[in-house]
From Swiss-Prot:
This is GDP-mannose-dependent alpha-(1-6)-phosphatidylinositol dimannoside mannosyltransferase. Keywords: Glycosyltransferase, Lipid biosynthesis, Lipid metabolism, Phospholipid biosynthesis, Phospholipid metabolism, Transferase, Virulence. The gene is pimC. The keyword Magnesium does not apply. Its EC number is 2.4.1.-. Catalyzes the addition of a mannose residue from GDP-D-mannose to the position 6 of the alpha-1,6-linked mannose residue of the triacyl phosphatidylinositol dimannoside (Ac3PIM2) to generate triacyl phosphatidylinositol trimannoside (Ac3PIM3). Substrate binds at G16, R207, E211, K212, E283, T284, F285, G286, L287, E291.
Length: 381
């Protein structure tokens, strides 16, 4: 099967979306399928990736106030699709590229839209709640009508489609790289670099943008300090809010690393921490938190996000969107025996593999056969 993936908001620092698209494409290739990926960039380029995916970059303009993201328009993508003649089309953009579903239908191509975010929650950051929901319902109804299937990564992500009565949704949880993100990445030197032996080391890993709410991690650290807890926070990531967050963190034991391109270095930081913080209230999956679990580090997550479907009572904690609640959850986690909490975190992450996610996606895309590797085999090395 020839699969074409299309993704806007895909770049060197685009985090979870890029990870998901790349890993799914790699697994499709490993299952014997031909995969092309169309993304925006500064110029036209074509590269054969080590995974076997052919990545085609189309020139696109920067989107203001997004920290460097670009978006390619549907017309340019349709021109490439005409030459590629795919069997299946997988789109990861519900706004600028939604019209590609109609192109697929007109050309007899199986079409899938992956819902990487809650559109009603996203719009709710700019519009009153009722207006945001009305906008999301209209856009989501068009998406559901234009695509054969809408893939949601969690029940939380699916809620806004359930609300409009869409009947062509499926739920496919994403995965985690269990080799890269592993408890063996824990490193005494890394921990010593960031914290003293007696400190509680917290880490917030993610893009420094409004929806991630890194400010809540800062406030939670302040609440811990006010309560007499010796804790330190490392914020790993880059984004448009960095300067504002650094000002907010003044005087607190908080370090900013900026963007870390080396995934092994990210894994080393996560594995060396005591607790990871993922306070974003709108997360539809939360790959960074899952990567933390894979490293054996429990996570505190927002009670209003999809991460409540990922985190279990023994692999972390769900907290209300208040600094005091997050701080209390941290103290509860670190009160448990370290060996037990780390083992439970890792065990929970092992359920989520890219092989399993890709098997479900290929079934949705209409593959007639799925390789054994993309089936029940779990990579728990």
């Amino acid at each position: 099967m020839r699969v074409v993936q299309v993704a806007n908001f895909y770049g060197p620092r685009s985090g979870g979306l890029r990870t998901a698209v790349d890993r799914l494409g790699a697994e499709y290739c490993a299952s014997g399928h031909e995969v092309f990926l169309i993304v925006p960039g500064a110029r036209t380029e074509r590269h054969l990736l080590r995974t076997g995916v052919v990545r085609i970059t189309l020139p696109a303009k920067h989107i203001p106030y997004t920290g460097g993201y670009r978006a390619v328009m549907p017309g340019a993508v349709r021109t490439v699709l005409e030459t590629l003649r795919p069997d299946a089309l997988e789109v990861s953009d519900r706004l600028t590229l939604r019209s590609l579903g109609r192109w697929g239908r007109e050309h007899g191509v199986t079409t899938v839209m992956i819902s990487h975010e809650r559109l009603d929650r996203f719009a709710g950051q700019l519009l009153p709640r009722r207006a945001a929901q009305k906008f999301a319902d209209f856009a989501n109804a068009r998406t559901a009508a234009n695509y054969d299937t809408v893939v949601c990564t969690t029940g939380f992500a699916r809620e806004e489609f359930d609300r409009i009565g869409a009947t062509n949704t499926v739920t496919v949880p994403l995965g985690v790289d269990l080799k890269t993100f592993h408890p063996r990445r824990r490193c005494a030197r890394v921990r010593q670099h960031w914290a003293t032996p007696t400190q509680i080391l917290l880490v917030h890993c993610g893009r420094l943008s409004v929806e991630k709410h890194a400010d809540r991690s800062i406030d939670a650290l302040a609440a811990l300090c006010d309560a007499g807890v010796d804790a330190r926070l490392v914020i790993a990531g880059e984004g448009p809010l960095r300067a504002r967050l650094e000002r907010k963190a003044t005087g607190l034991p908080i370090d900013f690393t900026g963007f870390i391109s080396d995934r092994h270095a990210v894994a080393g930081l996560l594995a060396s921490a005591d607790v990871a913080l993922a306070p974003g209230p709108h997360e539809t999956f939360g790959l960074a938190a899952l990567e933390s679990l894979a490293c054996g580090t429990p996570a505190v997550v927002s009670r209003t996000s999809a991460l409540t479907e990922i985190i279990t009572a023994d692999s972390g904690a769900c907290a209300d969107n208040r600094p005091e609640a997050i701080a209390h959850a941290v103290r509860t986690i670190v009160s448990r025996p370290e060996r037990h909490r780390r083992r439970c975190a890792r065990r929970r992450a092992e359920i989520f593999t890219w092989q399993r996610a890709a098997a479900s996606m290929l079934a949705t895309l209409g593959a007639m056969a799925v390789s054994t590797r993309c089936g029940d085999t779990q990579d728990t090395a």
